Amino acid sequence: MILPNAKAIIGFGFAVPKGLYKAMENGNQFYTYTTLGVKYIDEEMAEIFLLKMGGMIEDEGYDACLQKAIPNLKIKGDKTTNPEVVDTYELIHAEAVEEGKPVPDVIIDFGKAAFSCGLGEWGLNGKIINKEYGPFMRYCFIITDMPLETDNELKDAVCDKCGECIKACPGNAIDKNGLDSWQCSVYYKGAHKSNPFITDEFLKDNPERDAILNGEKRFDCESAREIYKELSFLPNTQWGYSPCLCGRRCDIACFKHLKGEM
């Protein structure tokens, strides 16, 4: 356990402005979503918020173990990736300090935490879906020994497996079983024909060019990392976030379905 004497986990959600998604949907602006909708919320707003909230809890004599997104690390045994960053690192060399204890670095499952807090649940598209904001949210948490009156876990499913996200993905990275994160990472970074920054020079000597652009090529860990070298349409941000060039179409389709717009 991260905090052995913990009594509660407190969840916080930050809404990403819908206008950032609309700008991508219209094909007018992509970089602002990556900077303001992902990086600044997770790396600055959430951090400051957690430190302030944690300070308030500890001023009352309790412990506050702050939990923010750790975008580029994967616990030992987790072979997935995070499409939002340049690459991820699995903690393959980590070992528990003694038998029966978890292998560090312990990273909480945000989807399970959000579910426990009544905030949302994992959807088919690999994002946490909230009843009000859909996937247009970022999250952070505090584990504490403060005795609190807690909310109930979610009782009703938020994701109804409608499949709109499956149809929307330009890289065919989602199916009825969920998200293929390595496939997603390639097309999130722009290897699809609807990427407005692609030129005729892109992969011009690659015999699989058409299959890649049409989302027909399947990528795994090795092949995805190999093609990353070609996906430099916009600069990566500070903290290593990759520009979102798929327009988060899966999220937009999910939100529209949730609101009865499709």
Predicted segment positions?
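Catalytic cores of enzyme domains
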Residues: T35, K39-M262
